[in-house]
Structure formats: structure tokens, C-alpha cells
């Protein structure tokens, strides 16, 4: 996997600097404790791929960035239900309310829950479809 330096997202779709700062300091470091396949390089790759895919759709860059950043955070509670736990972690982060409405957060939770490749259903939103596809790259 390629290594992406912090804040290096190579597309025209850019999330807000304040949101990036929060995620870079509070969320991405959590991936350091996960297995090598789900470490910081992985999450940075998924973020970059998600932003690249998202530029083809009418979607919110901040939402895509956050969904991609949180998609595997639930691994801290175990692999089997990590997609559900990741959604819970996203909703529990009260800082996100600075950038997102309750409705946006619900869409983001659904997208995080739906990213899993082994899921028996298709992602419910375009956000879930984008991050699920980026996670497979």
C-alpha cells in the first residue's frame, strides 16, 4: 500500500481544515494499534481513494472524509462487529457536531456500518458506496 503523509489528499475535493485537524489528531492515531492491514497507511489510503471517487458525485467532502476516517475505528472493540462499533464511535464523537447536523451524522453512521465487504446488503447511501469501494482498492 502506498504511504500517504498526513493531510496529503490528492483530489480537488478537500475537507475543511478544522475537521482534518480533529481527525488527524484524534482519530487516525487510533489506527496505530490495529493490525498492519488496518493501520494508518490503510486509513489514509481509504480517505484518499474515497475523496477521489467522491469528486464524481454530488456529495459533501467533509462527510466523505469523516466516514472514511471512522470506517474501521470499531476494530478497537473486535473484528466481527467492527462496522457497527465504528458507527457508534462516530456518533459518540461530540466534536463532530461542530461540522455536521444530526441528520448528516445518521447518514454517516449508516455509511460506516455499510462499508464492510462481507456485508449481506448493499450500502444504503452514496457515502457508504463510495467508502466501501475505496476500502476494496
Which residues fall in each region the model found?
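Intrinsically disordered, low-complexity cationic segments
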Residues: 1-5, 21
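Short, positively charged and aromatic/hydrophobic N-terminal segments
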Residues: 3, 9-12
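Intrinsic disorder/low-complexity signature
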Residues: 4-6, 38, 132
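A general marker of short, structured functional hotspots
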Residues: 5-6, 27, 111, 123
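Acidic/His-rich, divalent-metal-binding segments that scaffold phosphate/diphosphate chemistry
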Residues: 12-81
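Divalent metal-dependent catalytic cores for phosphoryl transfer on phosphate-bearing substrates
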Residues: 57-137
Amino acid at each position: 500500500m502506498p504511504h500517504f503523509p498526513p493531510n496529503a489528499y490528492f483530489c480537488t475535493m478537500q475537507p475543511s481544515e478544522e475537521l482534518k485537524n480533529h481527525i488527524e489528531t484524534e482519530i487516525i492515531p487510533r489506527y496505530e494499534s490495529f493490525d498492519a492491514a488496518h493501520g494508518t497507511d490503510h486509513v489514509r489510503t481509504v480517505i484518499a481513494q474515497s475523496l477521489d471517487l467522491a469528486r464524481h458525485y454530488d456529495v459533501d467532502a467533509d462527510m466523505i472524509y469523516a466516514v472514511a476516517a471512522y470506517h474501521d475505528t470499531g476494530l478497537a472493540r473486535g473484528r466481527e462487529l467492527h462496522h457497527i462499533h465504528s458507527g457508534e464511535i462516530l456518533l459518540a464523537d461530540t466534536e463532530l457536531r461542530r461540522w455536521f447536523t444530526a441528520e448528516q451524522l445518521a447518514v454517516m453512521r449508516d455509511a460506516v456500518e455499510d462499508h464492510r465487504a462481507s456485508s449481506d446488503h448493499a450500502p444504503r447511501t452514496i457515502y457508504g458506496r463510495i467508502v466501501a469501494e475505496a476500502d476494496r482498492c
